């Protein structure tokens, strides 16, 4: 009996001991979790503090970087009667390091940035940041005929192999950018206006910012910093992987023959239904495979065969299976609003997500609203309906109905008279004195006969002043919308 009781007491003691061990392990785990959590909090605090300190350090470039900054040239500023002026716009300082800028090949230089903060800053103030960059000219007629050049720039870290994502003028960080210099467009705002309106519609459109540019210390006037149609986190956000079959997300653009690489000959081109050339822009020429090239060519060819086939109107088996209808309708409307004669034939960007449908990205409206160099564009006719792909789409009453219904909606919002007027007024306020500075450099362009032909009244289309340019733009927009109200709005 006594032996049995001793056994039970020992067993109970062991159980109590095991329980205490379990409790001890639990307490130890809790303690470890608490310590780790504390370390995490402290670590995050340290990282954030370090980041903040880094941000504070980058409010101005370091002393050792000053020699890389091509500061404003005092003699040039005096020559244009500008002096050491201040601006509320972001300022870009391009340093070519004495090299000639080319269109065919990039040069390596650096670019310094003075961030705009809504308050006037001297353009001689120390920039906020400076980066290595490649620089080249871009454009077709703007490159060959106009003194004010367009630029394509790309930021890098320490070498040309390591791209650097930069938030240019407050836009989403990316390494590739376009600097559009309005020359033919004396209002300086055509591209900005249409891009901003397009960003309110279905599909992707570029973000933009007004900036002032210096190249090797010489003032170049007002430019528009523009997101090019590329893939990336702040851009199209297409899949960066492909399938073994060759299927891939892609970007192509239609433009003049011999203006790009990686051209594809699709069914529409070989059969004479489409014009100019299609170039693959994504995946890049350094990464694309032959299977992917073949897939992109066949994918667009299949769409074209259906579009120009007998049963193209069929809602299940016709062209609607291949395109994002809402996006294509909005693209059609914004280009007709801008009187963009080129839409579908030139500067036309098409993109497709892996497993998705074809979409279009708005691009290049410098010639919009009767600003073509070679001829007068009338406000009372449609243009896109005559161009590649859209000539066939317009034959489908369902597409036309979608366009008309959407146009009526947009006239109450994005394309309302009030909204457009507010946009234009905000741009003029934003630019302020920068307009005068721009034309102190490029004012002689008012004396050039850049626009051929005459307007509807038989008068020269050439603009004599900034005020005249603004009046021409607003008058053209008013007349254009009045026509579209009748043609698309049912009035």
Segments (PLM) and residue ranges:
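Structural recognition of the beta-strand scaffold that forms the well-ordered cores
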Residues: 151-154, 175-181, 188, 212, ...
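Middle-to-C-terminal accessory/interaction subdomains
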Residues: 43, 142, 281-344, 351-491
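Short, solvent-exposed loop/turn and secondary-structure capping segments
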Residues: 122-124, 146, 164-166, 190-191, ...
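Regulatory N- and C-terminal appendages and interdomain linkers associated
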Residues: 2-11, 16-17, 21-132, 418, ...
């Amino acid at each position: 009996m006594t032996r049995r009781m001793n056994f039970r007491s020992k067993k109970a003691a062991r159980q109590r001991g095991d329980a205490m061990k379990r409790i001890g392990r639990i307490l130890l785990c809790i303690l470890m979790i608490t310590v780790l959590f504390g370390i995490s909090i402290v670590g995050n605090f340290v990282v954030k503090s370090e980041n903040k300190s880094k941000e504070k350090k980058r409010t101005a470039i370091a002393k050792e970087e000053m020699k890389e900054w091509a500061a404003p040239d005092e003699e040039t500023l005096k020559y244009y009667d500008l002096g050491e002026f201040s601006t509320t716009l972001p300022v870009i300082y391009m340093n070519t390091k004495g090299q000639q800028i080319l269109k065919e090949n990039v040069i390596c230089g650096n670019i310094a940035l003075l961030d705009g903060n809504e308050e006037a800053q001297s353009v001689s103030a120390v920039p906020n940041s400076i980066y290595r960059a490649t620089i080249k000219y871009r454009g077709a007629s703007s490159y060959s005929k106009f003194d004010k050049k367009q630029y394509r720039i790309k930021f890098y870290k320490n070498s040309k192999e390591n791209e650097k994502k930069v938030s240019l003028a407050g836009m989403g960080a990316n390494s590739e950018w376009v600097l559009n210099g309005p020359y033919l467009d004396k209002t300086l705002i055509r591209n900005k206006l249409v891009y901003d309106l397009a960003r309110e519609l279905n599909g992707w459109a570029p973000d933009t910012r007004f900036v002032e540019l210096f190249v090797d210390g010489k003032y170049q006037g007002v430019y528009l910093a523009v997101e090019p149609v590329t893939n990336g986190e702040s851009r199209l956000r297409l899949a960066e992987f492909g399938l073994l079959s060759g299927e891939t997300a892609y970007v192509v653009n239609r433009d003049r023959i011999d203006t790009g690489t990686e051209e594809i000959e699709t069914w529409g081109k070989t059969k004479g239904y489409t014009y100019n050339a299609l170039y693959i822009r994504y995946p890049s020429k350094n990464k694309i495979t032959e299977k992917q090239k073949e897939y992109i060519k066949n994918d667009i060819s299949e769409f074209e065969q259906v579009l120009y086939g007998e049963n193209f109107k069929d809602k299940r088996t016709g062209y609607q299976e291949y395109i994002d209808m809402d996006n294509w309708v909005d693209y059609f409307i914004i280009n007709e609003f801008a009187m963009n004669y080129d839409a579908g034939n030139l500067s036309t960007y098409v993109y497709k997500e892996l497993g998705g449908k074809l979409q279009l990205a708005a691009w290049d409206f410098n010639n919009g609203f009767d600003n073509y160099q070679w001829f007068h564009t009338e406000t009372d006719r449609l243009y896109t309906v005559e161009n590649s792909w859209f000539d066939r789409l317009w034959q489908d009453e369902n597409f036309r109905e979608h366009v008309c219904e959407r146009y009526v909606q947009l006239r109450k919002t994005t394309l309302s008279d009030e909204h457009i007027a507010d946009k234009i007024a905000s741009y003029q306020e934003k630019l302020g004195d920068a307009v005068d500075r721009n034309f102190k450099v490029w004012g002689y362009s008012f004396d050039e006969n850049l626009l051929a032909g005459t307007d509807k009244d038989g008068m020269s289309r050439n603009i004599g002043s900034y005020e005249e340019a603004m009046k021409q733009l607003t008058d053209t927009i008013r007349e254009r919308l009045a026509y579209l109200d009748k043609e698309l709005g049912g009035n």
